[in-house]
UniProtKB/Swiss-Prot annotation:
Gene3D superfamilies associated with the record: 3.30.230.10, 3.30.70.240, Elongation Factor G (Translational Gtpase), domain 3, P-loop containing nucleotide triphosphate hydrolases, Translation factors
Cellular localisation: Cytoplasm
CDD domains xrefs: EF-G (cd01886), EFG_III (cd16262), EFG_mtEFG1_IV (cd01434), EFG_mtEFG_C (cd03713), EFG_mtEFG_II (cd04088)
Binding site for GTP: 17-24, 88-92, 142-145
Protein name (record): Elongation factor G
Segments forming domain tr-type G: 8-290
GO cellular component: cytoplasm
Classification of source organism: Bacteria, Pseudomonadati, Pseudomonadota, Gammaproteobacteria, Lysobacterales
Source species: Xanthomonas oryzae pv. oryzae (strain KACC10331 / KXO85)
Length: 705
């Protein structure tokens, strides 16, 4: 079957934003204007098409990125048809993992910002993630109809807080209740959308007299930004003082693709104004798969390799999301980077070293689906029937193996015990948690060996609340939940601490003998660059001359690695430690792998105790927005929680307080902040770093442990 849309007319992009910037409403309008959805769904009444998990509809926040395919021929229907693959991403801090996943497979992004709230803490997190993957992006300043809307202020914040070279493509006509439309700086015309047709029709008119000067200045800034793309454009601009519409778009597109500028559009998705012109911007300014560099990976021989975005290249794809679907079972969402795939084909998963057959291929539209026979370079689709694929795995042709970059997922910072309410829930709970962990790599499940309890870990209280909620709804498992526990870590401060341990047992017949001398040190920045660092631990074998035979060295490392999962202070994982094996001895008959494993484990425990062991606690970056009246109480409370204030900013709803606060002090903070501010203050937090816990905290944790 031939390709229906040339790859140059594909746009794979994500809609990203802070919670409450109006992202889901914006996505809904996109689906409406691209003809997919005939009734506009409103988040306010829990009917949005993109938010298809029950909880999202209740909470009014987007949790799972749903992939949707749509088509666009321009606001005035004059463009050739473009194919949009849109991924809606969550804006809540506990779900940054979802954002990270979708950014990995997108070519571009539209940042939705609130015209009142501006750049908020999550915006910074998502922006940093987009920088990590060099994702070209544009901004859409939404909610221009709301009280306190200020387009210029948001553009300034983009520059000041995110370091973006923001280039407005439009100027708003009015604001708040008086928001009417926009001035298109390319055409230097005013655009008004027709309310009766829900914004599907529009008209151009002359720019209102009071905005002519503002629009002229803004246009000059835009044209200058375009001219800086190349010497030819700059020469023409300097000689003639202007550029044609085509040249401006060419220059701006080049610079957007290089992530040098961020074009800015504005509107009100809720009032059906502005989204249509922003979609034209997606076509003009965001990349097609062919504009992005070939995807990089490594071949079977661990050598670097690439795949170009063409149908003739060998097939390669990345699985970026696994979902359990009530009708078809497990769905694997994947992005095709190169080649073609037909339903029924076999693919190879180099991460698991397994072949799998792709059953059906589904083109997803939010929660509707259409079965298709094949996918090609640039497509995003979902496969049914893949059993052993996890998020971040590569799928490729068996005869041309490539492993694309693995996604790196953060370690969970919070844990809690869960137990089934009834015996019949026991088995179902194990299956439910297994499924949920397969879908979400930032969620972990383990059994505590001592207590036999099931421990779940994740990125925040809301994250775990939603997991427990999903167990109830999707798997009918009722569970009791323990109190949240902080994920502490253990490390050492002293360097070059020697530890010598001999494991020798003689009791008739074959004895046991293993003797090791190790040196413990904290890892340096240089150490961290080593390829041998795994789980934040480095093992170095310094044995020469066969003092310990080669075949026992892996047992020494294994003994060490097994010991660091439960540290000597309070049973938390050990991090940031380097262990050198420097000396030892063996016995021809009595030495065994087990003996060396035990010797290494005991040597580590004894050495760790002598190396100034310390407990580390997770520190959260917290941003609180509070009306001025409650500022004193809020800041006093931050200090009581051992918080360190990082600074203050102004915001339309009061003051923004930035602080670093230990996670152990943040449980139940949402409730206490609400009562302190009569429900008017809000906060968000994300994990920032680990640091040494004060002695009183360490003692309390150790006693508990």
């Amino acid at each position: 079957m031939a390709r229906t849309t040339p790859i140059e007319r594909y746009r794979n992009f994500g809609i990203m934003a802070h919670i409450d910037a109006g992202k889901t409403t914006t996505s809904e309008r996109i689906l409406f204007y691209t003809g997919v959805s005939h009734k506009i769904g409103e988040v306010h009444d829990g009917a949005a098409v993109m938010d298809w998990m029950e909880q999202e509809q209740e909470r009014g926040i987007t949790i799972t990125s749903a992939a949707t395919t749509a088509f666009w021929s321009g606001m005035d229907k004059s463009m050739p048809q473009h194919r949009f693959n849109i991924i809606d991403t969550p804006g809540h801090v506990d779900f940054t993992i979802e954002v990270e996943r979708s950014l990995r497979v997108l070519d571009g992004a539209v940042f939705v910002l609130c015209a009142v709230g501006g750049v908020q803490p999550q915006s910074e997190t998502v922006w940093r993630q987009a920088n990590k993957y060099s994702v070209p992006r544009m901004a859409f300043v939404n909610k221009m109809d709301r009280t306190g809307a200020n387009f210029d202020k948001v553009v300034e914040q983009l520059k000041a807080r995110l370091g973006a070279y923001a280039v407005p493509m439009q100027v708003p006509i009015g604001a708040e209740d008086g928001f009417e439309g926009v001035v298109d700086l390319l055409k230097m015309k005013a655009i008004h959308w027709d309310t009766a047709s829900q914004g599907t029709t529009f008209e151009y008119s002359d720019i209102p007299a009071e905005l002519v000067d503002v629009a002229t200045d803004a246009r000059s800034f835009m044209v200058e930004a375009a001219a800086e793309a190349s010497e030819d454009l700059m020469d023409k601009y300097l000689n003639e003082g202007d550029l044609s519409e085509e040249e401006i778009l060419k220059g701006l597109r080049e610079r957007t693709l290089k992530v040098e500028i961020v074009p800015v559009f504005c509107g009100s998705a809720f009032k059906n104004k502005g989204v249509q012109a922003m979609l034209d911007g997606v076509v003009h300014l965001l990349p097609s798969p062919a504009d992005r560099p070939p995807v990089q990976g490594i071949d079977e021989d661990e050598k670097e390799d690439t795949r170009a975005a063409t149908d003739t290249a060998p097939f390669s794809a990345l699985a970026f999301k696994i979902m359990t679907d009530p009708f078809v079972g497990s769905l694997t969402f994947f992005r095709v980077y190169s080649g073609t795939l037909n339903s029924g084909d076999q693919v190879y998963n180099p991460v698991k070293s397994k072949k799998e057959r792709v059953g059906r291929i589904l083109q997803m539209h939010s929660n509707n689906r259409e079965e298709i026979k094949e996918v090609r370079a640039g497509d995003i689709a979902a496969a049914v029937g893949l059993k052993d694929v996890t998020t971040g795995d590569t799928l490729c042709a068996q005869d041309k193996i490539i492993t694309l970059e693995r996604m790196v997922f953060p370690e969970p910072v919070i844990s809690m015990a869960v137990e089934p309410k009834t015996k019949s829930d026991q088995e179902k709970m194990g299956m439910a948690l297994g499924r949920l962990a397969q879908e979400d790599p930032s969620f972990r499940v383990k059994t505590d060996e001592e207590s036999g309890q099931t421990i779940i870990s994740g990125m925040g209280e809301l994250h775990l609340d939603i997991i427990v909620d999903r167990m109830r709804r999707e798997f009918n498992v009722e569970a009791n939940v323990g109190k949240p526990q902080v994920a502490y870590r253990e490390t050492i401060r002293k360097s070059d601490v020697k530890s010598d341990y001999k494991h020798a047992k003689q009791s008739g017949g074959k004895g046991q003998y293993g003797h090791v001398v190790i040196e413990l040190s904290p890892m340096t920045e240089e150490d961290r660059k080593s390829d041998n660092v795994k789980d934040d631990f480095l093992f170095i074998n310094d044995i020469t001359g066969g003092i310990i035979p080669k075949e026992f060295i892996p047992s020494v490392e294994k003994g060490l690695r097994e010991t660091i999962t439960s540290g000597p202070i309070a049973g938390f994982p050990v991090v940031g430690v380097k262990v050198k094996l420097v000396f030892g001895s063996y016995h021809d008959v009595d030495s065994s792998e087990m003996a060396f494993k035990l010797a290494a484990s005991m040597a580590f425990k004894q050495g760790f105790a002598k190396a100034s062991p310390v407990l580390l606690e997770p520190i959260m970056k917290v941003e609180i927005v509070s009306p001025e009246d409650y500022l004193g109480d809020v800041m006093g409370d931050v200090s009581r929680r051992r918080g360190v204030l990082q600074g203050q900013d102004d915001s339309p709803s009061g003051k923004i307080i930035n602080a670093m606060i230990p996670l152990g002090e943040m449980f139940g903070y949402a409730t206490s902040l609400r009562s302190m501010s009569q429900g008017r203050a809000t906060f968000s937090m994300e994990f920032d770093h680990y640091e040494e816990a004060p002695a009183n905290i360490a003692d309390a944790v150790t006693k508990k442990g």
